[in-house]
Amino acid sequence: QTFQIPVTSDPDAIIRDATIYLFAVNDGAVSELASLIQRPQALNIHCAGSQSTQLTAASGNRNAVIWPIYSITKTTQPLESIPLIVDGNSPEAIELAQQLALAVSDNVRTLNFEQRKYLHLNAVLVNNFANHLMAIAEQVSREHQIDFEILMPIINQTAQRIKDQSPQQLQTGPAKRNDTATMAAHLELLSAHPEWQEGYQSLSASI
């Protein structure tokens, strides 16, 4: 769906009499941009999941959040079913943000700031950290002439299985079995990368 709305990355080109401002920028730039607008009548919306609605308070006192639980890039566009998390500093701000979010996705949830902080933590765990572990596996594969593609079925299986069962119940592997011999062998294989050894040990202890 295409919205006929002005978009700019130039602060000097910001329309000064708009009724809604959506700050889809780096978290650290939101407050500064909001201070350039200072339009109390407008609804100011940012997309930073781990930040308070007050991040845009420099512009006015009607503030909200619409946060997509999805890694959006120029080449990866969001689907209509992706979760959009809504919050606001008043019932009116929440309602308006919900209306906008529902025009984009059919999966809109309202969470308060405390809940959003924990959800943001969870998103980092399942997305950023999981991706980093796969990046390590890819590098190990490359260093030892192994086709990383071999791991795709088990990667996909892991993502599919947790739709029906708790990840905690599905946990397997040497750490779960307390197979110290296998874990020691793995640590030896990672001897060239002490930081990976440390991560392996920490994760194994947590399991």
Over which residues does each language-model region extend?
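Rossmann-like NAD(P)(H) cofactor-binding subdomain of soluble oxidoreductases
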Residues: 3-77
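Interdomain hinge/lid region at the active-site interface
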Residues: 158-207
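Short alpha-helical
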Residues: 28-29, 51, 91-92, 116, ...
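Predominantly flavin-linked oxidoreductase catalytic cores and closely associated redox partners
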Residues: 62, 69-78, 89-90, 140-143, ...
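Internal alpha-helical scaffold of NAD(P)-dependent oxidoreductase catalytic cores
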Residues: 2-6, 78-163
